[in-house]
Amino acid sequence: MSQFIAMNRFKIVPGMESEFESIWKTRNTYLEDVPGFIRFNLVKGPKREDHVLYASHTLWASEQDFEAWTKSEAFRKAHEGAGSRGHLYIGHPDFEGFTIVEGAGVG
């Protein structure tokens, strides 16, 4: 079974980067005990004229593990209150899912 990468791309209002990052740094993701979860990263991309790009990046043992998480209590808890922070975002997050075909790495 192939590993799976799940990414959400966020367009953040310029000047709101610190607030956005603080939310991610202080929240409980509830991922540690989810079957198939391997790793999480929040990454910051380029600053554009109208937004700053961020992406959440999670690595899963399989796409099935990711799908099961999206239907779980842990997912619901991790996303509580997300709708109350609309002032930070330009539009909705864009989801992208990828099956790993080939890879290399250390450790």
Label every model-predicted segment.
Residues 12-20:
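Short, surface-exposed ligand-recognition loops at beta-strand->loop->(often short) alpha-helix junctions
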Residues 1-4, 41-53, 80-107:
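Glycine-rich beta-strand-turn "strand-cap" elements at beta-sheet edges
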Residues 18, 64-66, 103-105:
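Residue-level signal for secondary-structure boundary sites
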